[in-house]
Amino acid sequence: MLTQQLGVLHASGARGFFVPGNHDWDSMQPGGWDAIRRQERFLAATGGGATLLPAGGCPGPVVVDVGQVVRLVALDTQWWLQEGPRPAGPTSSCPTRSESAVIDSVRGALRSAGQRVVVVVGHHPPVSGGVHGGHFGWQDHIFPLRNIKPWLWIPLPLIGSVYPIARAEGISSQDIPSRAYGRMRAALDSAFAGSPPLIYAAGHEHTLQVIAGTSTRYVLVSGTGTFGHIDRVTALDSTRFARSASGFMRVEFLSDGRARLGVIIVDHAGNAAEEFGLWLN
């Protein structure tokens, strides 16, 4: 899959940033830190303008300025949730070695942005109407095995409710209701409070969501770049757009700082069309 993504990037001639998530960290396995460093070496070996941000398993933030118009602030949010080895403490070679140092650096990156529009990118969204947000449908309660294999339509009423209820109660650190995830959200909210970014862009959920944020103007969840790999989604009170469909999002920045979002849906024939558009500022 990574090779296919790189092929698209190389063909376009664009500069690409890969922001790590839980799967890049080998799904929280003890060897996750080694896995993310192997991926970094692979990207470097392919050339063509692909960069892992942040690198080395470091939490970030890494700041990339695009002239005087846009400031990109990249975070490795899995660093906060990783249960195995990670670069932290006095032995770490990362610029930020603790959670408090990360937050201080994020706060500084926002305050020093000047007139630039700030976009924060991190794999895990702060809010979501998807399964990681604890939102499950009736099918999850009746046919829970479909979360393992989509074709396992085996009804397990009552017993099947154990899985979605446990997820909604935060049994997994990859879910928003969990204690570890909540601590990360609260820390980032405190960093954003003084100078809220325009956009927090995330993946994690296999959905397309545009949500009006609290500590950030908009939360963009775009996680269906792999065709057919989609999950259900629930519209929240703050949702501006939500779809369970394959596609991606595009944000265009004008020289005067205005930003326009386009949500692109892709069909089985490979045709792409904008289904939702919004001026963000």
Regions found by a protein language model. Name each.
Residues Y181:
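The feature captures the conserved acid-bearing segment of alpha/beta-hydrolase catalytic domains
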Residues H123:
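Extracytoplasmic/periplasmic solute-binding protein
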Residues H204:
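Conserved active-site segments centered on acidic
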Residues M1-V118, G129-S172, A193-I199, T207-R243, ...:
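Extended active-site neighborhood of metal-dependent phosphoesterases/phosphodiesterases
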Residues L188-D189:
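Active-site neighborhood of glycoside hydrolase catalytic domains
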Residues I176:
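Extracytoplasmic
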Residues A212-S215, T239-N281:
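A short C-terminal boundary segment appended to hydrolase-like catalytic domains
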